[in-house]
Amino acid sequence: MSRIGRQPISVPKGVEVTIDGKDVKVKGPKGELKHTVPPSITVTLEDGQVKVSRADDRPQTRSLHGLTRSLIANLIEGTSKGYTKTLEISGVGYRVQAKGRNLEFSLGYSHPIVVEPPEGITFRVEKPTLLHVEGIDKQKVGQVAADIRSLRKPDPYKAKGIRYQGERIRRKAGKAGK
């Protein structure tokens, strides 16, 4: 059995898990999320814990077992605590500012770049060089943060651009002089 898949997921107070056929709905203080479970995986709710089991031992089913358990755990954590990705902007003249719900980036291009948040995502600008992407869906938060990072990836020579907080940029040596 999958080591991750066999671990039960404890449901914290204030979070309600509903299993309706192959749909798992999680409702918490921050919002509501839903996940459809693959046909070969079964999800049960027993005394405050969600348990994930599989029907057979085929390789595909075995891989889906641990994945499903992790996805449901992410739903529970997202609806109770939420997720945040922090991005740092470094470089001369590189900055971000909030314009209502949208973000306006100055990244050395001839024009400012405006980014609209998708549904369920909020932006928080702490400083002109520090941005927080927040939401309850872990996948969506990570995808939006990756899309923002791709606007100006960190340069390996000067390390300027948008990077995740704590991300180490592998620096390259410049051209060797004479």
Curated annotation (Swiss-Prot):
This is Large ribosomal subunit protein uL6. It comes from the Bacteria. The keyword Ribosomal protein applies. One of its GO terms (cellular component) is cytosolic large ribosomal subunit. GO terms for molecular function: rRNA binding; structural constituent of ribosome. Pfam families: Ribosomal_L6. GO terms for biological process: cytoplasmic translation. The keyword Membrane does not apply. Gene3D superfamilies: Ribosomal protein L6, alpha-beta domain. This protein binds to the 23S rRNA, and is important in its secondary structure. It is located near the subunit interface in the base of the L7/L12 stalk, and near the tRNA binding site of the peptidyltransferase center. Part of the 50S ribosomal subunit. Belongs to the universal ribosomal protein uL6 family. Keywords: Ribonucleoprotein, Ribosomal protein, RNA-binding, rRNA-binding. The gene is rplF. It comes from Thermobifida fusca (strain YX).
